Regions:
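Core segments of cupin and vicinal oxygen chelate
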Residues: 1-46, 69-75, 80-95
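Short cationic amphipathic helices and targeting signals
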Residues: 5-9, 58-63
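Short low-complexity stretches enriched in small and charged residues
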Residues: 12-21, 49-50, 54-59, 104
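Short, conserved turn/kink motifs that form compact alpha/beta structural patches or helix kinks used as
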Residues: 37-57, 63
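Short, Lys/Arg-rich amphipathic alpha-helical interaction segments
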Residues: 94, 98-105
């Protein structure tokens, strides 16, 4: 089952409420704190995602129960990656839009 999780937008300046995710070398806000479920993301130059489409364009994120199952048949741009303890993510294009699937265990 897929459920809308957030809209990820790129920023190049610090945003109030952002936290550091060391595993990905990014700063990000929590979409749970935004009424429109927006996640602001800022990439450090050393981020493994810095030179990928993930760091260059917005994405729509869907929470999924089983990431591996949902990714079957998808041509991945990035991932799957361990974003945080218990959180796995992967990105792919769907009709020209960048999509993130996110699994929380």
């Amino acid at each position: 089952m897929k459920k809308f999780h957030h809209l990820g937008l790129i920023t190049h300046t610090a945003v109030s409420g952002e936290v550091w995710y060391d595993s990905l070398k990014v700063w990000g806000t929590n979409p749970d704190d935004d009424p429109n479920r927006i996640e602001w993301v800022r990439f450090a130059p050393a981020s493994p995602l810095a030179e990928t489409p993930v760091a260059k364009m917005p994405h729509i994120s869907w929470a999924v129960d089983d990431l591996d199952q949902e990714l079957q048949g998808k041509q991945l741009v990035v991932g799957p990656l361990q974003a945080a303890p218990g959180v796995r993510i992967a990105y792919f294009f769907l009709d020209g839009a960048l999509v993130e699937y996110l699994e929380v265990k």
